[in-house]
Amino acid sequence: MAATNHHTYIYVGLAGEGQYLAEGGLYRYAASTGEWQSMTQGLPPTPQVRALLIHPDNPAVLYAGTQCGPYRSDDRGEHWEALETPREGRDVWSLAFHPHDPEVLYAGYEPCAIYRSEDGGAHWRKMHTDAVVFPHITTYMPPVCKRVIGLTADPGNPSEMYAAIEVGGLLGSRDGGESWTSLIDGTYVRNNTLDLHGVQVSAAAPGVVYIITQVALFRGRERGRHWEHIQIDEMFPGGSYCRGLLVAPNDPTLMYLAAGAGGGGAPAGTPEAGALFRSCDTGETWERVDIGDTPPSRMAQIAIDRAAPARVYCCAQRGQVYMSHDHGHTWQKTHVPVEMSRSRHIYPMVCG
C-alpha cells in the first residue's frame, strides 16, 4: 500500500500529426493541488512529445521522446537534458524499460529504427532491423513512413521483445532486441489491422502478445504465431479505434484499453467519441468502465501510479483527463490548460 503522503503527478505529452506540427508541449498535473504546469525547460522549441517513461523505482526520473531525439529529467520534469544518440535529430515515437532493469532502455524511431541503452540513456546502440520485410499491402499504398509506435518485452522472458509499427504490422526479437523480424501471420493481415498502435505482454500470460489497431484488439498465442480477435463493445459498426493498452504494474491480470470512434477504420462521418475498457482476467473478457462522461474525442492512453495502484488515469486526445483514486469506481475530470487542435493533442501519458 502506498504511503498516505505520496503525491501523484500526471504527465501528458502533446504533438501534432501529419503536416500539423506547429505546436506541442509537455504538461504536469499535481493530483494533490489540481494545478497544471508547462514543463518544457530544456526541451526543443515547440516540442513534439510522443513518448514518455517514468522510472519504476524513482518517479523523479523521466524520459521523453521528441522530434529531436530522447531527453531525460531527474527532477520530475522541471529541467530536461538531451541524450546523445547516433540518430540525432530524428523523431522518437516510443520508449520502454527492460522489465527487470530500468537502466536498460529502448527507443523506437521514425523511420523504423530501434536503439538500446544499458546505462540509463547515456549511451545508445542501434539494433538490427535490416532483415525486416514489411507486409506488401502496406508498401504499395502511397508512401507511409514506418514508425515504431510501441515497444515491450515479455516479463517472464525479456529476450522476447515486440515492436508495434504504425501501418507496418508487428516485429519480434528473440535475442533481447539485438535483431528483429516481421511477424505477420494470422488474423491481422488486412491493411486496417496492420495499422498498429500498441503492443503488450502480461506476466500472467507468458508468450501471449496483445496488439491494438485502428479497428480492434488482437491476441497472439505462442509468441504471436496464432492470432485471434478479442471482442469488446464496438464503438462503430465493425470495430473500435484502439489507441492505448496497459497492463497494470501491480496486477498482471488487470488490463485497460483506450478506444474510440471516428477516423481510422470507422465509416466516413462517424462522430468521434472515447471510451475506457477494463479486463480483470488477462484479456479474456472486457467491460466498459463508467467514467461519468463520454469524451468527444478518442480515448488515448491510460496510466496507473505504481506506488498507489488505486490511482488510475486516462486521457482523450483533445485534452480531457479522467482521474480515479479508488480503482476506477468513481471518477473526476480535468483538462489540459491549452487549446487543442490537429496541431496539438495528447499522445503519451504517465504518472507517479
Residue ranges and their predicted role:
Residues 1-352:
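Extracellular glycan-interacting surfaces
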